[in-house]
């Protein structure tokens, strides 16, 4: 029974993170395609770097996978299963929301870059700031599970 509760946390850590990545990447990819279309329609070069905008939210799935495995190891090492479950649920949600909103910012970045051709470094900086939330969540969750 104890491990079954922990399985909920493991599933949420990965599942919620991956759902956020799917939504975020979808938003960013749609905007990238739209920006490329505008570039082609106006005879401007289409910046390939927008592929990176589209893929940025995918890293949160990796963080969810890592957290899932850390939860399993923590429970096998004697960590409370309820703590593991709730850590997986709330950390998975935080990581997933980070990916969701990172995708929205990446979508806005693709639109802006497609229209102006400028600001790439600035766009990556703000995308990276949102990534930091997921990294902090992963690290703080690992500390909580020790």
Q: Which residues are covered by each model-predicted region?
A:
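Hydrophobic, small-residue-rich transmembrane alpha-helices and their short perimembrane loops
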Residues: 1-146
């Amino acid at each position: 029974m104890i491990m079954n509760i922990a399985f909920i946390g493991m599933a949420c850590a990965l599942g919620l993170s991956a759902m956020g990545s799917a939504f975020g990447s979808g938003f960013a990819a749609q905007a990238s395609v739209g920006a490329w279309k505008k570039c082609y329609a106006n005879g401007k070069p289409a910046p390939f770097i927008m592929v990176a905008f589209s893929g940025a939210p995918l890293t949160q799935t990796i963080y969810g996978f890592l957290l899932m495995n850390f939860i399993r190891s923590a429970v096998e090492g004697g960590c409370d299963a309820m703590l593991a479950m709730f850590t997986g649920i709330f950390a998975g949600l935080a990581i997933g929301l980070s990916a969701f909103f990172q995708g929205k910012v990446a979508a806005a970045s693709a639109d802006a870059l497609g229209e102006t051709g400028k600001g790439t470094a600035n766009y990556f900086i703000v995308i990276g700031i949102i990534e930091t939330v997921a990294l902090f969540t992963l690290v703080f969750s690992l500390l909580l599970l020790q």
